[in-house]
Regions:
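Alpha-helical substrate-recognition element adjacent to the catalytic core
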Residues: 1-65
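Short, acidic/turn-prone active-site loops that include or flank metal/cofactor-
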Residues: 63-69, 106-110
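Conserved Lys-Pro-Asp/Glu-containing loop-to-beta segment of HAD-superfamily phosphomonoesterases
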Residues: 65-88
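Alpha-helix termination/capping residues and helix-transition junctions
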Residues: 54-56, 74, 96
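Acidic, Mg2+-coordinating phosphoryl-transfer loop and its flanking beta/alpha structural elements
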Residues: 81-117
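Short, well-ordered alpha-helical microsegments
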Residues: 45-49, 68-70, 89-91
Length: 122
């Protein structure tokens, strides 16, 4: 099963402003398990990329909020998740693009975010 997770940064990831509950180590383990990961944020794309690179995470995409439909068109996955902290931006954009939406404190307990194996296996 191929899983794609889009992360908001501010209010979602620990490196955000304000900091969120999801750690970069959690994101790294998720990516290493074979899940497609990237960011969808209000931050400039260059700033998003710099965060991933600073933490040694091989991200698959870094886009602005309105580009979530482009992510879905580019990557074939069985399920698409967006994790964010705002109703007006994160949740609305995610649902409009056909992503399932999770608040950070909900997502942290989901098994697909805490995988140890290869998510691409059936």
């Amino acid at each position: 099963m191929v899983i794609l997770i889009s992360f908001d940064i501010d209010g979602t990831l620990e490196v955000g402003d304000p900091p969120g509950v999801l750690t970069m180590d959690l994101v790294r383990r998720t990516q290493e398990a074979g899940i497609l990961v990237g960011s969808c944020s209000d931050r400039p794309i260059s700033g998003q990329r710099a965060i991933w690179e600073k933490h040694g995470i091989a991200y698959d995409f870094a886009v602005s909020k309105h580009q979530l439909p482009d992510v879905k068109a580019k990557f074939e996955a069985d399920v698409y998740y967006h994790i964010g902290d705002r109703e007006d931006l994160d949740r609305q954009y995610a649902l409009a693009a056909g992503f399932e939406f999770f608040w950070p404190d909900e997502a942290v307990s989901e098994p697909w975010l805490n995988q140890d194996g290869d998510s691409k296996k059936s």
